[in-house]
Amino acid sequence: MNEKNLKPASVFYYFEEICKVPRPSKREEKIIAYLKAFGREHGLETKTDEVGNVLIKKPATPGKENLKTVILQSHIDMVCEKNSDVEHDFLIDPIETVVDGEWLKAKGTTLGADNGIGVATELAILAATDIEHGPLECLFTVDEETGLTGAFALKPGFMTGDILINLDSEDEGELFIGCAGGANTTAEFTYQPVSAPQDYFYFRVAVKGLNIFYIYVRLMAETCIMPYLVRHRHYVRYL
């Protein structure tokens, strides 16, 4: 990745750095070690809890000591998926990135910007010497993608801040003040396969490195087959 052309430069510098560190969900030990080393190198108070959450504190700049303490939070794990024709071991291999026009992409794998860009933003702020701020606490939680176990394991007193800003969002310039939450549902049922009618229309959609549902909807819209599918109850098989 040529981070020199990406802005803010410090954010993308640290994003490139953490792309070199494997961080699958539930296997975050290498990125935890990286964060602890970062804290030591910058002379910042750093601690971890029993599940691996990391907290790095940065004192206020002179004259800002009386401001409320702000917590910045992001998760350090990433979704690890790759194209079938790509050789990649997420436990040892770095993420290879490439700038494609206005997009930063990974070569045949997930990029890990969720939530690596949040982690990189926090590291850039912690390393900065030209930003005025009150007391800061940067919280890095584990295992968001497969259960939120890091967030659920947080205990009173681990952080002391008054305001928490979560950096795991979609777009810049938007601030969420609440959410609908989430839930897990487990269902059990008896599955009995049946033969599909011979006069039905079948097709298979194969897409690499893209959102299959987004592409499928666009395909239906552009080929005008949505009304046909609705009228004739055609089967769709996802790969």
Give short role names for the model-derived ranges.
Residues 64-140, 145, 151-162:
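Active-site metal-coordination/substrate-binding segment of hydrolases
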Residues 5-12, 25, 29, 116-119, ...:
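Electropositive phosphate-/nucleotide-binding environments in soluble metabolic enzymes
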Residues 2-102:
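Acidic/His- and Gly-rich active-site-bordering loop/insert found
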